[in-house]
């Protein structure tokens, strides 16, 4: 009876969600791709220009710099965050006293907004750099890059730690006990049992950290603003700067084209990463 009712009325329940998906995501997405082939000031003042916007991207030195800076930043931040989060999770699953308090402390930075974090860390890091006689974040591309790494690591390590803790807690104690009986060392247990068994967690955390690194915007805006001379400007901020900070209808279309390229880049790298890490997962 219930099954027949669901079969009869399921479109009524699906329709609101589907309509929200089409209106809120699908239609803006398709329209955004079309606008990347146009020059415009508003959506009612659109002129089709073909691939002109995409060809101009290739000649934009700020875009190419932001592109490669973002790729390096995303991979470096992903590696550092995952390695540190895993070893912190490993330490916090040993049953030491105060473990829950440490978990809470490590997770709390994830609850703070990116803009607020950017200004907080800007004050902290500039104070330290000034004391040490080093260039401020806005005056050194190297210091700005390192500052963004520190900020993102501080913000996200706690969240990834929770995922790794969940994975480590699901590793069967029987497997570890059997390995210990067979004379396996702690190092061997870590690399041959624990890490292979938590590969689903590694897949999730790597995906999240990679995509977060690629699309980082608010922290970049508030911490360095892309200074000096846009040398610390990541791709999301470069797109924003192109779309809003430059005048003229051609820049709107170029900014939209950059956004499409950015979307394709993130999707391709995320799919490659998911395939690579998923293939290492152990069937339980």
What name fits each language-model region?
Residues 3-284:
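A structural signal for multi-pass alpha-helical bundles of membrane permease subunits
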């Amino acid at each position: 009876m219930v099954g027949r009712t669901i079969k009869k009325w399921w479109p009524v329940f699906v329709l609101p969600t589907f309509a929200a998906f089409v209106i809120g995501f699908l239609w803006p997405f398709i329209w955004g791709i079309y606008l990347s082939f146009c020059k415009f000031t508003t959506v009612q003042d659109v002129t089709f220009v073909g691939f002109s916007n995409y060809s101009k991207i290739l000649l934009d030195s700020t875009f190419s710099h932001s592109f490669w800076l973002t790729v390096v930043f995303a991979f470096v931040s992903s590696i550092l965050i995952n390695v540190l989060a895993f070893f912190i999770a490993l330490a916090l699953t040993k049953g030491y006293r105060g473990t829950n308090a440490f978990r809470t402390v490590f997770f709390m930075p994830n609850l703070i907004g990116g803009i607020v974090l950017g200004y907080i860390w800007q004050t902290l890091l500039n104070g330290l750099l000034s004391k040490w006689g080093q260039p401020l974040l806005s005056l050194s591309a190297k210091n700005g890059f390192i500052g963004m790494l520190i900020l993102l690591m501080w913000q996200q390590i706690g969240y990834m730690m929770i995922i790794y803790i969940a994975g480590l807690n699901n590793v069967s104690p029987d497997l570890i006990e059997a390995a210990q009986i067979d004379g396996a060392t702690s190092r061997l247990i870590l690399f041959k049992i624990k890490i292979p068994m938590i590969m689903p967690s590694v897949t999730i955390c790597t995906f999240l950290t990679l995509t977060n690194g690629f699309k980082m915007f608010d922290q970049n805006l508030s911490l360095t603003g892309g200074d000096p001379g846009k040398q610390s400007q990541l791709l999301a901020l470069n797109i924003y700067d192109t779309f809003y900070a430059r005048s003229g209808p051609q820049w709107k279309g170029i900014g939209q084209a950059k956004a499409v390229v950015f979307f394709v880049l993130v999707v391709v790298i995320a799919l490659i990463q998911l395939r690579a890490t998923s293939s290492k997962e152990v069937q339980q």
